[in-house]
């Protein structure tokens, strides 16, 4: 399986310098504007929670991470999911275009565009690229089953049961799983502790919801 973007040059991964960074209230206003279903909102909150926790830890470890930008991109990563469920199309591509239109912030949109799969090699030995918006959002999304934080294995075993009806589908799911494990190992190596079974204090978020 070859991702259609894989033949293109890798993008620059920089902290946002132009456009706005919407806070939670502004992100939720966009959820309303684009008619996001309640279950996708709950999923997005958990993805944003995990991405934010990871971004804060990376920043505390000395990496130059814009935590607010990571959170906003994670909150908006599935902004077009409801539309795509109803009408088809790539929710990542459409969502990225909406985020550019609404915020003029291409770094946030990059996280939305690439949250399903990073089509190039994961920069395991380049922490300045690894600790960027797309990888926080990709990994956080892979750790959430519906609206619960779970280990990668639990998430992907569920996906294989629900969607692995063909060999092509199973191959795609396994490739995504492998990429999640690669990002996880790289995060662990640079942060200096294990995150593969970390709940990121997600119970606190569930209690507040």
Identify the residue ranges that each predicted region occupies.
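Divalent metal-dependent phosphate-bond-processing catalytic cores, especially two-metal-ion Mg2+/Mn2+ enzymes
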Residues: 1-18, 33-63, 76, 120-209
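Acidic-glycine-rich active-site phosphate/pyrophosphate-binding loop
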Residues: 17-25, 70
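A short small-residue
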Residues: 25-34
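Alpha-helix N-cap/N′ positions at the starts of helices
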Residues: 26, 90-91, 135
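His-Asp-centered metal-binding catalytic motifs of divalent-metal-dependent phosphohydrolases/nucleases
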Residues: 47, 65-99, 110-119
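Post-HExxH zinc-binding segment in Zn-dependent metallohydrolases
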Residues: 102-106
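A structural motif
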Residues: 107-108, 148
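Boundary/linker segments of alpha-helical solenoid repeat arrays
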Residues: 108-109, 167
């Amino acid at each position: 399986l070859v991702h259609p973007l894989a033949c293109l040059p890798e993008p620059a991964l920089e902290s946002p310098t132009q456009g706005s960074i919407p806070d939670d209230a502004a992100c939720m206003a966009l959820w309303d504007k684009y008619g996001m279903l309640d279950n996708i909102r709950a999923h997005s909150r958990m993805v944003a929670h995990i991405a934010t926790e990871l971004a804060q830890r990376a920043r505390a470890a000395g990496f130059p991470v814009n935590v607010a930008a990571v959170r906003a991109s994670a909150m908006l990563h599935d902004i077009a999911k409801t539309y795509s469920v109803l009408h088809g199309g790539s929710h990542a591509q459409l969502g990225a275009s909406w985020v550019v239109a609404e915020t003029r912030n291409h770094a946030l949109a990059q996280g939305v565009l690439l949250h399903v799969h990073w089509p190039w090699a994961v920069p395991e030995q380049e922490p300045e690229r690894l600790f960027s918006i797309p990888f926080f959002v990709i990994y956080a999304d892979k750790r959430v089953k519906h609206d619960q934080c779970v280990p990668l294995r639990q998430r992907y075993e569920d996906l294989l049961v629900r969607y692995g009806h063909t060999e092509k589908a199973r191959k795609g799911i396994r490739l995504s799983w492998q990429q999640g494990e690669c990002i996880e190992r790289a995060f662990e190596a640079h942060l200096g502790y294990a995150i593969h079974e970390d709940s990121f204090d997600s119970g606190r978020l569930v209690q507040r919801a």
